[in-house]
Amino acid sequence: MKRILTVAAGLALALSALPAAAKGDAEKGKQLFYTCTGCHGIADYKNAYPTYRVPKVGGQNEGYLIAALTGYKKGERSHPTMQAQAESFTDREIADIAAYLSSLKPAQ
C-alpha cells in the first residue's frame, strides 16, 4: 500500500510539472492569416488545381485547425501550397492562427 501511495504521489508530481497546452493568441493569428486570405478569403476560388475548391476556414474547430496545419507541416496531408505555407509556421503560430479562425463565425 505504501508503495502504491509513493508511486501515485510521484506520478502526480510529474504530471503537475508538465506545461499547460498553449492557448493561441487570436490577435497574432489574425496578422498571420493575412497572407492566407489570398486563397481562403475569395468566394468560390479555385487554385492551380481547377478541381480543388479552396475551403473557407473561419469558424472551424480550433483543434481540427491545429491538427490540419500540423499535418501539412509534417507532410502527413498532401497539398503542395498548404505544405509550403505550414512549414513556415512555428507550432505557436499554428496555435495563434487556429485561435483566430475558430473565433470567427462560419462562412455561409
Task: Go through each PLM region and give its residues.
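Periplasmic/extracellular electron-transfer cofactor-ligation site
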Residues: K23-V54, G71-T81, L104-Q108
